[in-house]
């Protein structure tokens, strides 16, 4: 189990940041079930990815294409359901109704003013 460092791979990928992006992409591929090109030797996926890059078993061009392909994909969550055409008008109607109703603070202050006026109008004679 030889120790792999960034220095071992820097002659294959000249930019350290690119190297890390590509190694992370390969580690994600390995986690997703991609075949290993060398013996794991109890190493974790990022170390295996760096070893594959250092030994030139995986080319940076292949990883770069896979990385760009993954970045271009759009993944919709269950909550991100596209709106229907009619829902826009329903939203506008709900907004209009909300704008017509008085705010909660205004209603309670009006009630308090009415109660005070009623109390003042009581004749104690």
UniProtKB/Swiss-Prot annotation:
UniProt key word Transcription: yes
GO annotation, biological process: DNA-templated transcription
InterPro entries membership: DNA-dir_RNA_pol_omega, Pol_omega/Rpo6/RPB6, RPB6/omega-like_sf
Pfam families (UniProt xref): RNA_pol_Rpb6
Residues annotated as transmembrane: none
GO molecular function, one term: DNA binding
SMART domains on file: RNA_pol_Rpb6
PANTHER family reported in the protein's UniProt record: DNA-DIRECTED RNA POLYMERASE SUBUNIT OMEGA (PTHR34476:SF1)
Assembly, per entry: The RNAP catalytic core consists of 2 alpha, 1 beta, 1 beta' and 1 omega subunit. When a sigma factor is associated with the core the holoenzyme is formed, which can initiate transcription.
Family named by the database record: Belongs to the RNA polymerase subunit omega family.
Function comment: Promotes RNA polymerase assembly. Latches the N- and C-terminal regions of the beta' subunit thereby facilitating its interaction with the beta and alpha subunits.
Cited NCBIfam families: rpoZ
Listed name of the protein: DNA-directed RNA polymerase subunit omega
Gene name linked to the record: rpoZ
């Amino acid at each position: 189990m030889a120790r792999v460092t960034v220095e071992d791979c820097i002659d294959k990928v000249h930019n350290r940041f690119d190297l890390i992006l590509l190694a992370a992409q390969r580690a994600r591929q390995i986690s997703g079930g991609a075949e290993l090109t060398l013996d794991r030797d109890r190493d974790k996926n990022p170390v295996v990815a760096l070893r594959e890059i250092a030994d030139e078993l995986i080319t940076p061009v292949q990883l770069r294409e896979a990385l760009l392909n993954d970045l271009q994909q759009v993944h919709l969550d269950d909550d991100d359901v596209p709106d229907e055409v009619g829902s826009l008008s329903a939203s506008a109607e709900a907004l209009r109704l909300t704008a017509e109703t008085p705010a909660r603070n205004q209603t309670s202050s009006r009630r308090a003013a009415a109660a005070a006026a009623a109390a003042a109008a009581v004749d104690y004679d």
